[in-house]
Regions:
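N-terminal leader segment of winged-helix/HTH proteins
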Residues: 1-46, 93
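Charged, amphipathic alpha-helical coiled-coil/dimerization segments
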Residues: 2-7, 87-149
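Hydrophobic alpha-helical core bundles mediating ligand binding, dimerization, or RNAP-core interactions
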Residues: 21-43, 118-136, 141-155, 159
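N-terminal helix-turn-helix DNA-binding core of bacterial DNA-binding proteins
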Residues: 33, 37-80
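Amphipathic alpha-helical interaction surfaces
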Residues: 34, 65, 87, 91, ...
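Short acidic DE-rich linear segments
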Residues: 161-163
Length: 163
């Protein structure tokens, strides 16, 4: 089993300066806060609570989803997913259909209104991301993207150690 090595552990060999650690923590916190503020703005702009917004975004990758599949992807219990689904059904953004292979299973799919809302959200997000990239000098974009990829891989590796 993997585990996270404490900075005080005898197994800890690679040094990270206190300055680097503090700077990293502050930058991650600021990025997280910025993302949370953007998420709140998006939810208000598109008239959806956070959980319904995140659930709707899952349909960008899939044509059909089940409540169980949504629960796994969102990392929430099935009863919570039921409330999220009910909200999206009430707003007529998704609809239920019976699985042709197993009538006990309900498949969830976007309605035309749901497709339109998702397209609007994706267009908005593309515009935001485009504007962010425009703030970075063209000759620095590749390095920024490479470093973000390294950061993502590092964070995923540490996450695996926590499991």
């Amino acid at each position: 089993m993997n585990q996270i090595v404490s900075r005080n552990s005898p197994d800890y060999t690679v040094e990270v300066s206190d300055y680097q650690l503090k700077q990293f923590q502050e930058l991650i916190l600021k990025l997280f806060q910025c993302c949370q503020e953007r998420m709140q703005y998006q939810c208000e702009r598109f008239g959806l609570p956070d959980a319904e917004f995140r659930c709707l975004m899952l349909f960008g990758e899939e044509r059909y989803l089940t409540a169980k599949g949504i629960a796994l992807k969102m990392n929430v219990v099935k009863s919570r997913v039921s409330k999220i689904i009910e909200g999206l059904l009430r707003k007529k953004l998704i609809h239920r259909i019976k699985d042709p292979e197993d009538s006990r299973i309900s498949l969830l799919s976007l309605t035309a209104k749901g497709h339109q809302k998702l397209n609007n959200i994706n267009a908005f997000q593309n515009d935001v991301h485009h504007q962010v990239l425009l703030q970075i000098a063209p000759d620095q974009r590749k390095a920024v993207l490479t470093n973000l990829d390294i950061l993502k891989a590092s964070m995923e590796a540490v996450k695996e150690m926590m499991v």
